Every structure is written in structure tokens, then in C-alpha cells.
Amino acid sequence: MGFFSSLSSLFGLGKKDVNIVVVGLDNSGKTTILNQLKTPETRSQQIVPTVGHVVTNFSTQNLSFHAFDMAGQMKYRSTWESYFHSSQGVIFVLDSSDRLRMELLKDELMMVMEHKDVVSRGIPIVILANKMDIPGAMTASDITVALGLNLYRSGTWSIHSTCALTGDGLDKAMQQLSAEITKYMESRRT
């Protein structure tokens, strides 16, 4: 079996390693989402707030992800951009029930979407509208309008409703991200 996996990697048939940056305001559910994406036997039983960054590894059908889970507290947000240049994708997690911080959220999201490394390289961005299970949470379409996402060219970003606690919506979002990253990597080879 080791021989065949080595052979498939040699011919480019194995899983491709990719780096992604996972950002968003504090308490949006970034770490819980990444924990949900891991295999059941590797999931943590207790989630603690991220300080600085933590690397989490997980896989989809064709990609092996190295996710840089970035702290969302204000004092750490300036470090996000130093990871964009070596990433093939960005996940931006937001708390869809946190209406009070929508303006701040918009500013931080625009910083990511307009960052020179993200724009010049065409890095795909998947926005996870998390905590959709909370009563009064905004819908993905309401968030799109509130954040002005409809002003950005489609194809560079997508938004998905999720619930980190149950995993609802994560499969679809990761399929989208995997497809966009695969397309991105293929375009970089030509």
C-alpha cells in the first residue's frame, strides 16, 4: 500500500497539500469549525480561544489542508496578512447572529478581500456565515447585502450558512473551497 501511495504521489494522483488561512473576528467559531473538519478520532473535546495561530490539518477527497487558524482578537488581526502570500485559499468565518459588529466585520472582510496578495494571486475566499442555528441570525443573503459583497466580482468568493456545533453546511462549503483551490492551482501551472 505504501508503494502505491508513493507511486500515485509521484504521478500527481495523490492528495495535494494546500495552505489556507482561517480568519474572522473573535468568537466567530473558527476553531470549532476546524475541529469539526477533522476526523472524529482526532477532534478535541474542549475548544479554547486561539492565541496567535494554530495549525490544524484535515483532508477532503483530493486535498490535504494545512489550516492556519488565526486569532480573531483585535491585537492579532494585523498578523493575518503575513500568511496570505503562502496560501491557496482563505476561509473567513463570521458570527451571523452578531449584528452589533457588522461594521467592524465589514472592515476586516474588506481588508482580506482587497489585500494585494489575495487580489493579485486570485486566491479563493469562502465566507462561512456561522451560528445560523441561533434565533435571529442573519441569512447568507442578508449578510451579502450588509457587507457589500454584491459589489465584488463573483467567482472570487462564496458565502455558506454553517453551524460549527453540528457541522451543518460545512461539507458543501469545503467542496466549494476544494473546487476553487483546485481550479486556482491548475491556473497557476499554466
From Swiss-Prot:
What is the top-level taxon of the source organism?
Eukaryota
Keywords (alphabetical) are: Cytoplasm, GTP-binding, Lipoprotein, Myristate, Nucleotide-binding
Instruction: List the cysteine pairs that form cystine.
Output: none
Main localization is cytoplasm
The entry marks the following residues as binding GTP, namely: 24-31, 69-73, 130-133
GO biological process assignments: cilium assembly; intracellular protein transport; intracellular transport; PERK-mediated unfolded protein response; protein localization to cilium; vesicle-mediated transport
Residues lipid-modified (N-myristoyl glycine):
2
What do the Gene Ontology cellular component annotations say? axoneme; cytoplasm; cytosol; dendrite
Q: Name one Pfam family in it.
A: Arf
Task: Describe tissue expression.
Answer: Specifically expressed in ciliated cells.
Location of this chain's protein in the cell: Cytoplasm
CDD domains listed in its UniProt record: Arl6
Q: PROSITE patterns recorded for this chain? A: ARF (PS51417)
GO molecular-function terms, A-Z: GTP binding; GTPase activity
Q: Which residues form the signal peptide?
A: none
Task: Report the family membership.
Answer: Belongs to the small GTPase superfamily. Arf family.
Q: Which PANTHER family match?
A: ADP RIBOSYLATION FACTOR-RELATED (PTHR11711)
Give the NCBIfam families listed for this entry. small_GTP (TIGR00231)
Please state what the protein is called.
Answer: ADP-ribosylation factor-like protein 6
Q: Which source organism?
A: Caenorhabditis elegans
